[in-house]
């Protein structure tokens, strides 16, 4: 990847992260999808996992608990074995957050604002 495309990827990730962290799930999905189309290998798998988490949150916001739980689990599965991939995101803390949220969803526990996933930049 040349310097220009690396800068473009970082800019795109910054935009996508902000959308995600502002709970703009649909827009974050679109932003991460653009990134997903430009990467491959493990990076692509991580981005796909984040995409799935974003869609899971969209489902959750619409009251679709089953869809949210399934997509959250699939997204977590894609990311948790690839936490060493350097995308400028703290994937370890992200996975911990997702595991806690998944457990609450699976056990039908009450959720609060602090349960929404957050992508922490490194």
For each predicted feature, which ranges?
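TPR/TPR-like alpha-solenoid helical repeat scaffolds
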Residues: 50-53, 84-105
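TPR/TPR-like (Sel1-like) alpha-helical repeat modules
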Residues: 65-83
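Residue signature of alpha-solenoid helical repeat architecture, marking inter-repeat boundaries
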Residues: 6, 44-46, 93
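Terminal, low-structured helical/coil segments at or just beyond the last alpha-helical repeat
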Residues: 96-122
